[in-house]
Amino acid sequence: MKELKHTKSEAMFKEAVKYIPGGVNSPVRAFGSVGLNPIFIDRAKGSKIYDVDGNEYIDYICSWGPLILGHSNEKLYEGIEETLRRGTSYGVPTEIEVKMAKLITEAYPSVDMVRMVNSGTEATMSALRVARGYTRRNKILKFEGCYHGHSDALLVKSGSGTITFGVPTSPGVPEGTVKDTLVCRYNDIEAVKRIFQEQGNEIAAVIVEPVSGNMGVVPGKQEFLQFLRDITKEYKSVLIFDEVITGFRLAYGGAQEVYGIEADMTCFGKIIGAGLPVGAYGGKREIMECVSPMGPVYQAGTLSGNPLAMHMGYKNLNILKENKDVYERLEEKAKRLEEGFNKNIKELGIKATVVRFKAMLCLFFAEGPLNNYDEVSKCDTEMYAKYFGEMLKRGVLIAPAQFEALFLSDAHTDEDIEYTIKANYEALKELKC
């Protein structure tokens, strides 16, 4: 095994902490939960990413999900220079925004209209406002471990970095802001039933990740998601599927296509921007017509629907639309990783569980079942930290936190998969020493 040097990354991090909180612009990038300093990236191509010290890694972060076709895909870049030369932002409408909206609504039968924003956080925040305006109710129901961005109302018992850093509800979020946020255990039908029996007529919306990708990977059970669909209809609440991660990743029609369940509203991000900042929320026409300027619910954004993000997103979605076998390839790769990891775990006698749903995958250092926040939060995070370091030494970059998903791209090769399984075996073997 070749020893990797990180001299330049260490120097850059030392400089970064002088000017940026924690040296990073998003907490998980600091590598703090795995006890290391971050590597700084120079470039990326295909399935590989290269740090400033010249080290090469097989990348399973993939910018946390947007890069389903891999890094620096040439097809995505076709025409981007011309788009750039025409102008980066206008503040008035463009044709590409209409094309992009039409493409999304065609992929999702539950979405009649869609509004572009700049991030997944904006998408979920705006969707809640619209749902409240539409129903004229205030309360919302979310689930422990589901992360819906960092807006105040949703930063309660969240997943992602809030588990990693042990801050389930962030300081700086006033109690008054979250007094109307109800929280239930994920995959727990009886708990949801009790809340609706007590407060159902006050609940504006239920927001859920159909497959949670921010407490590792925890799939919503079919019967659980169907129950949410049924009970929200009964009480005339809005069912919001947060598909920022799952949208256009599990299938071209996302989780709703896979489960066969249609939400009232859907939030998008990541893949619809192909690596550029973007988000969107959409839903039934009668709900979306509440949004300004058609209706009274205000939401706006200077850079929403900007030409560069729309160009990349439109290209990305069209490639996926015309090449839906991408999803079969992604699932096959994920399945091979799952089988390889499980074989290694069994052979070495490691207490770990691999959870896979379609092409979403996570290795938990805990024994299953893992169906909710309480079960997932018992993972051995110290063991994961050691595992991360051993994989990094072997040139495999995975999430620097136990509670994040492993992301595959169409650029990952058979050789990448085989090498990763081999590296996994060696890393797990080191943990036993």
Swiss-Prot record:
Pathway: Porphyrin-containing compound metabolism; protoporphyrin-IX biosynthesis; 5-aminolevulinate from L-glutamyl-tRNA(Glu): step 2/2
InterPro entries in the record: 4pyrrol_synth_GluAld_NH2Trfase, Aminotrans_3, Aminotrans_3_PPA_site, PyrdxlP-dep_Trfase, PyrdxlP-dep_Trfase_major, PyrdxlP-dep_Trfase_small
GO cellular component: cytoplasm
Molecular functions per Gene Ontology: glutamate-1-semialdehyde 2,1-aminomutase activity; pyridoxal phosphate binding; transaminase activity
Catalytic activity: (S)-4-amino-5-oxopentanoate = 5-aminolevulinate
Cofactor: pyridoxal 5'-phosphate
Main location: cytoplasm
Enzymatic class: isomerase
Entry keywords, A to Z: Cytoplasm, Isomerase, Porphyrin biosynthesis, Pyridoxal phosphate
GO biological process: protoporphyrinogen IX biosynthetic process
Localization in the cell: Cytoplasm
Taxonomic superkingdom: Bacteria
SUPFAM superfamilies associated with the record: PLP-dependent transferases
Positions carrying N6-(pyridoxal phosphate)lysine: K270
Enzyme Commission number(s): 5.4.3.8
Assembly and interaction partners: Homodimer.
Entry similarity comment: Belongs to the class-III pyridoxal-phosphate-dependent aminotransferase family. HemL subfamily.
Name assigned to this protein: Glutamate-1-semialdehyde 2,1-aminomutase
Species of provenance: Clostridium novyi (strain NT)
